[in-house]
Amino acid sequence: MPRSAWRSDHDEEDNRVTASLTLPPEQSANCAYFFDLDGTLAEIKPFPDQVVVPKTILQCLHRLATQNADALALISGRSMVELDALTTPFRFPLAGVHGAERRDINGQTHIVNLPEVIEREAGALLHAALVTLPGTTLETKGMAFALHYRQAPEHEAALVTLAERITRRWPQLALQHGKCVVEIKPKGSNKGDAIAAFMQEAPFAGRIPVFFGDDLTDETGFAVVNRAGGISVKVGSGPTQATWRLDSVRDVWHWLEKNNSSQQEPKATNNRRGGYESFSRSI
C-alpha cells in the first residue's frame, strides 16, 4: 500500500508528519478494534447478498482479536444473522442494524424491539410503494428496513420522501442515509452508542478504541471514538469526522495483513463473564 493511502485528515492543518502504515506501537498493544463491514472489510456489490469477506481477511481479523484479548467487534447496518453468515467460522462480538441489536463478548444479546404492528404495517406500506419504483429493493430486518436504489438512482428523492412519511407516522422510527440506501431504523439506535456500550465492558474497557468505517452511518462511531481519544479511520473519500483515512477496502486489507505480521501472538486470555441471560429491550 502506498504511503499516501494511510493519512491523517489533519496533516494539512498542522505540521505533524503523515502516519506510518501501522498504528503507533505504543497504542497497538492496548487497542479495542471496531470494523464496519460493507465498504470497509468487503467491497460493495450491486446487491447485498453478493458481498463476501475474503477468508484471508477473516483470518486476519481473528488473529487481530486474539492479539488484543478478543477486543474486536463488527459494527454494521446488517443484521447479526447476516454478519455471522459472512464471518463464519469465526464468531465475533457484533452490533447489527446500526446498534439496534448487539451481542457482547459473552454471547449475551441486547435487542431493540419495535411493536409488531409497526413492523407489519410499515413493511406493507414500503413493499407497496417500492413496487411502483422499478429497480429499487426493500430489505426487511425485523426492526428496520433498508430501501436500496443503487440500480435506480433516479428514485432516490422518492425513497427519501417515502421514508420521511413513514417516520412521521411512527415517531419510534428514524431515517438514516447511506450509500445508495435509505434506512428506517429504531429511533435512538446508532453505531456510536453501540461502540460506547462495548467500551464499558470487558475486554474493551480501558483500551484505546479504533474504528474503521466508510459511510454516513459510521460518523456517530467516529465521534464517540474521537471523544475517547481513539483512532477513527474513514475508508474512501468524502467529508468526515474521522481523523485518519484509508483510500479503499483493499487498503484496509493491506493494513490488516501488515498489522498481523508485525505483532506476536500473546497467551490466550478468557474475558468472558459468567452468569448472564439474554434479554431484549422494547420501545
What are these regions (language model features)?
Residues 136-153, 174-185:
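Charged, glycine-interspersed solvent-exposed loop segments at helix/strand-loop junctions
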Residues 97, 103-124, 176-206:
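Substrate-recognition "cap/lid" segment bordering the active-site pocket of phosphatases
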Residues 24-47, 74, 195:
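Asp-based phosphoryl-transfer active-site loop
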Residues 3-6, 11-16, 28, 54, ...:
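Mg2+-dependent phosphoryl-transfer enzymes with acidic/Ser/Thr/Gly-rich catalytic loops
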Residues 39, 94, 147, 195, ...:
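Residue-level signal for inorganic ion chemistry
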Residues 52-141:
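Active-site phosphate-binding/coordination module
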Residues 79-95, 155-174:
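Substrate-recognition/cap helix-loop segment adjacent to the acidic, metal-dependent catalytic center
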